[in-house]
């Protein structure tokens, strides 16, 4: 994985070969020794050990107001749970006081999340429970969900938990 920072806050966390990985223009990257990177590595170690990793490292997310709103909602999805793109769209509609928001627009914002795992975009699934649209790959999405105790089989989670 590659981490990026503004020196104080995490601005990016990507799997190698991930879709939308920024090829240029990264601020401080892992090559620099930053306490934040040590903190993030420790958080990830706890996460991958199957533990509750605790509070997330400090973040600085940059994007359109719509993307930022989606990413804030992603941060509210509890470990071990999934939410549909459509449910997030409906939450945004309520917060805005009306006006349609499409699940596809939510999917676009989710897919461009610059801080994988920490901002848990892997916890968002299709309305039928399908594991679609993960920039890190569907197999990786399934592995992350299983690590959190979510039942996954045949590229989907059971509809009863969606």
Regions found by a protein language model. Give the residues of each.
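Nucleic acid-binding interface residues in structured DNA/RNA-binding domains
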Residues: 1, 51-162
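Compact structured core domains
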Residues: 4-56
